[in-house]
Structure formats: C-alpha cells, structure tokens
C-alpha cells in the first residue's frame, strides 16, 4: 500500500515547546527545540519530562513516515531515561529518532536528545500502534497567542496542585497534539509534576526515568487529573506511581516515575 511522507504537524505542544522539524523519513528523523527559562520550576527544578514532547515526536514520526497513507500511529508506551539537566539559556537542543522494528500494526523506535555541547540529556523507547484514519492530522489553527518566554511551563499549561500529589491540567490548546488529544509528552510532564508534588519537592529532586503506558486518548478540550502515590521514598531514590484520568473519569495514562536528588543536592 502507498506510503506518504507526513507533514510535521505543529500542534499546541510543539508551539509551546518551540519544536521544529529538520528531517523525517521512514527510518530516521531529526528535530530541534529551543531551550529557555520557561523550563525552570520551583517544584521540579527544571522540567526534564518536557523533553518528552520532542522525543515523542522524533520517534513517532518515523513510524508515521513508513505507514500506509490511511494509517496513523498512536503511542502505547514511552520510557524516558532522563540523564541530564535541560539548559535554560536559549541554546538549541537536537533530537534524533530511528526505527527499531515495524510490522503491519505497530512500530518500535528509539531516540535521544542532545544539548548544544553534545551531551545526551535523555533517551526514549517508544512503542506505537497504527490506527486507521480518514485523514492524517494537519497543523491546527489556534486563536490563543503562544505564551511568551517569560511564562513558565507550569503557568502556560495552567497546572494546578489540588492537594499534595494531585495536579490538574485544565483544557488547554497548548497541551494538544494534531489530533486534538493531550500530547504524550505533555501527559509525561504532568506525571513529573504530580510525582514531585507527592514527594513535597522544592527544586532539590529530579526525575531520572518515567515509564508510561497510554491506555486511552485524553481529550485536550477537557481537564485531566494526575494523582500520584509514593511507592518508595529513600535518600538515594524514590519511586512514585502516577495515574492520569481524563474528563470522562477513566484513566488515560499510568506511569512509574523514578526520582533522585539533584546532582548538586547529593
């Protein structure tokens, strides 16, 4: 069946995180992202999970580029290994993704994002499932101005701590992907914020891995709640389970978040 190289869809999440395409093929892809002070946060320190947007895209689009023209990939699971601190100085980050395996219904991809100095900040493994679609996603029109660089990620997404360990993401066009659902990378970011809230973090902890299963789409036009449960708390490592529940009251994502002290706090 015919395959068509997809347009890189600049959804709300891509605009918010300043993500752009360099190259997209059925075997490899490269994207870029502008860093900035919006990644800093008083609770999570610097949002490492926000790298999930570019990493989800750079691996997911490899599967999309090799899929039949009436199929589109959605993520079943993403594992992020978060190795370093995203810079906040305006430097450009580069992400690369590559195909590991593909069949008629799914694809597996891996990738990484590196800083301008060549240091690896994060790794991803993604498993995707192909859906039959009447038309592939296209770049949506958003009539709300993109938040400026002085607006933090927490503020731009209007993330709100309901109580310790419970964080709410209201309806927000800048949380969405091209299909109108909450972007996988934004869901992962919510997982990070909820996990840190449950631990009572104040900038001294960092997420080192986030392993997320996506069990159903989350409509970006409705609120999503992230509820965290601490499974282990220790001086060297803590483990938190986070469940994201969509507006229909059903889980849309379940994650295990591993947290360690920030390097300067060890």
Language-model segments: which ranges?
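Non-catalytic linker/capping segments at the edges of enzyme domains
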Residues: 1-38, 125-174
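The feature marks the first
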Residues: 15-16, 20-27, 33-38, 49, ...
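Short coil/loop residues immediately preceding or within conserved phosphate-binding loops
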Residues: 16, 77, 108, 209, ...
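Hot-dog-fold acyl-thioester-processing enzymes
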Residues: 30-63, 169-197
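Preference for bulky hydrophobic residues occupying beta-strand positions
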Residues: 33, 78-81, 111, 169, ...
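Hydrophobic beta-strand-centered segment that forms part of the acyl-chain substrate-binding groove
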Residues: 43-46, 60-94, 99, 195-225, ...
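HotDog/MaoC-like acyl-thioester-processing domains
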Residues: 61, 73, 86-148, 216-221, ...
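Structured core of small recognition/catalytic domains
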Residues: 167-253
